[in-house]
């Protein structure tokens, strides 16, 4: 089915309004609901799941240090409309688990562990059933962190890929009042772009595969797939939308909320992006980019200056295929900018060179160095299973950093693909990447480097919480753990990998407790 591109205006998600607000705290309520939305002018309405019945969910905008509480409520149907594989992470408990489980993770949030959205802290409709790690109905987000682009999404055990694909995603923006001095584009010129990919049937329904291609007769049905990319790209819940802009500077907060797909974004007129931030907030200094790679869960904070493009139409393009080349008719396109609106007032916003101060990584303060490898195996059905350090989810915890300590994690990737690795609770700095001989490593376990360590490009010199670990490279990151202790996770953010079984619990310990 061919859908005409750039016929629907880009929706700007509503900002969530608090139920109660005082100097001490702000309280929100959000309900997960089944809903229908018309994703394209020529499509029938699509059944989705959305926060407050919206896809994407409402944007939550908070100030740095604002004490925020959110009651996340599940009002979803008792059965899923996407294919559940009951052979992965099935419950060993005596009580039957509900088919539809949810829990919300604030991605990039520095939050207590009982508000982090631990996969086994799930809850069913009206909290009738809860997972073994469920602790509270109202989550607490202290927002004691830098201004940054965060996002919230489902994180339920073995269901994350399906619940997110169904629509359970939304943006969460922390505003730092100190940013005002930088005079960045603001208000209606500060726009979130939440990018997803889907396959949509002619009747408007979402397609998600119930089995891998050419499945063997022995496979369970439904059966998890190792990856999935839809050929139809949506931004803020619309298929290939357009945005009318003024000939001036705009700030775009770009979030990759896709399950598997990595994008390589550029402007089709050869124009530049000015990157001002990444996952964890502003960069030390702005970076001029002609293109940038955005893996699942990564965020880029960019400025596009349309001043010289009055009257033009510009396509935000993608050159990264998913298991093959991009199709110029489909996934090579993201959205269109139309520089057709008159300038409302003089543009006094800036593209500052220097943005934020950064402490250098103090190598003498490193308390621990961990070597962790990405690995692959097969399950009893012959399906691929990707692992972290050859451990399954339910194996004993092996990563136990102490609160306040700084560690270097050396992540070895001998697999065939790039994996976006996400650590909960912390932001980290990228130290370097170094190529190694995969064949020798697979054969003998010997790490034989084939080139020098390469420091991160300027676009990765800020705070990160999700980072691309490329095939055939050792990635080194430095993280200071805390300020909270408790049970968190780290995982690959390709959701099909995360669900089976590329996710591990992580205990951040406090020796004083």
UniProtKB/Swiss-Prot annotation:
Known uses: When expressed on the surface of E.coli cells, CotA was shown to possess improved enzymatic properties, including higher thermal stability and stronger inhibitor tolerance. It has high enzymatic activity against three industrial dye types: an anthraquinone dye, Acid Blue 62, a triphenylmethane dye, Malachite Green, and an azo dye, Methyl Orange. It may help decrease the costs and simplify wastewater treatment, and therefore, surface-displayed CotA shows a great potential for industrial-scale dye decolorization. CotA is also a promising candidate for the clinical determination of direct bilirubin and total bilirubin, which are significant diagnostic marker of liver function and cancer.
Regulation of this protein's activity per its record: Inhibited by azide.
Activity across pH: Optimum pH is 7 for SGZ and bilirubin oxidation. Optimum pH is about 4 for ditaurobilirubin oxidation. Optimum pH is below 3.0 for ABTS oxidation. Optimum pH is 8.0 for UB oxidation, whereas optimum pH for DB oxidation is 5.5.
GO CC, any one term: outer membrane-bounded periplasmic space
Keywords, ordered alphabetically: Copper, Metal-binding, Oxidoreductase, Repeat, Sporulation
Binding of Cu cation 3, residues: 155, 424, 491
Temperature impact on function: Highly thermostable. Optimum temperature is 45 degrees Celsius for SGZ oxidation. Optimum temperature is 75 degrees Celsius with ABTS as substrate.
Reactions listed under catalytic activity: 4 hydroquinone + O2 = 4 benzosemiquinone + 2 H2O; 2 (4Z,15Z)-bilirubin IXalpha + O2 = 2 biliverdin IXalpha + 2 H2O
UniProt: Cu cation 2 binding residues: 107, 153, 493
Effect of residue 480 to A: Retains approximately 60% of the wild-type activity with both ABTS and SGZ
Record's subcellular location: Spore coat
Disruption phenotype: Disruption of the gene does not prevent spore formation, but mutant is blocked in the appearance of the brown pigment characteristic of colonies of wild-type sporulating cells.
Effect upon mutating residue 480 to F: Retains approximately 30% of the wild-type activity with SGZ but does not affect activity with ABTS
Functional summary from the UniProt entry: Multicopper oxidase that catalyzes the oxidation of a variety of substrates, including phenolic and non-phenolic compounds. Substrates include syringaldazine (SGZ), 2,6-dimethoxyphenol (2,6-DMP) and the non-phenolic compound 2,2'-azino-bis(3-ethylbenzothiazoline-6-sulfonic acid) (ABTS). Has no tyrosinase activity. Is implicated in the biosynthesis of a brownish pigment that characterizes sporulating colonies of B.subtilis, and which appears to be a melanin-like product and to confer protection against UV light. In vitro, also shows strong bilirubin oxidase (BOD) activity, and can catalyze the oxidation of free bilirubin (UB), direct bilirubin (conjugated with glucuronic acid, DB) and ditaurobilirubin.
Subunit structure: Monomer.
Comment on protein domains: Glu-498, located within the entrance channel of the trinuclear center, plays a key role in the protonation events that occur at the trinuclear center and in its stabilization, controlling therefore the binding of dioxygen and its further reduction. Asp-116, situated in the exit channel of the trinuclear center, and its hydrogen bond connectivity are highly relevant for the overall reactivity of the laccase but do not appear to play a critical structural role.
Protein name: Laccase
Naturally occurring in which organism (per UniProt): Bacillus subtilis (strain 168)
